[in-house]
């Protein structure tokens, strides 16, 4: 783990670092206790509403999904990352970027659709597969509708 570094010039760099850490670790143990508390500064990217920053989060989460597929990680965990990816994706769609940023959002849309199709072929429960049909067709619209009915949907998913 000596050569691991947070990537330069990326927002949400901890997401990229987590991917590299996962790939370079022999074992990972989950500790279900609080080990430390942290305070988020007002100037932190965690508090930003600058949508361009979310483009890096799209890249990091897509990278994680690719890692999960490549390493045979559970489809359920991959599904969870895909669902998490829909929030920053929807923010970026609403921003209506131009040029290179617009192309990044379009690539993300194709990636989301491809991932939904792959997961539909797997062993996920029927309800999750049904949600993937909508995600595969219109990911940003699906997220906006789902977030409105989140509490009811969580009972099924």
Please report, for each region that a protein language model flagged, where it lies by residue.
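Conserved nucleotide-sugar donor-binding catalytic segment
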Residues: 1-52
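Catalytic core of nucleotide-sugar-dependent glycosyltransferases
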Residues: 33-41, 47-75, 88-119
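Gram-positive cell-envelope targeting signals
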Residues: 22-25, 30-31, 45-47, 54, ...
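Membrane-interface aromatic/basic loop that binds lipid-linked glycans or pyrophosphate carriers
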Residues: 98-157
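A general structural signal for well-ordered secondary-structure junctions
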Residues: 27-28, 74, 125
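Amphipathic, positively biased hydrophobic alpha-helical segments used for protein targeting
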Residues: 14, 83, 147-150
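All-alpha amphipathic helical-bundle segments outside canonical DNA-binding/catalytic cores
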Residues: 74-83
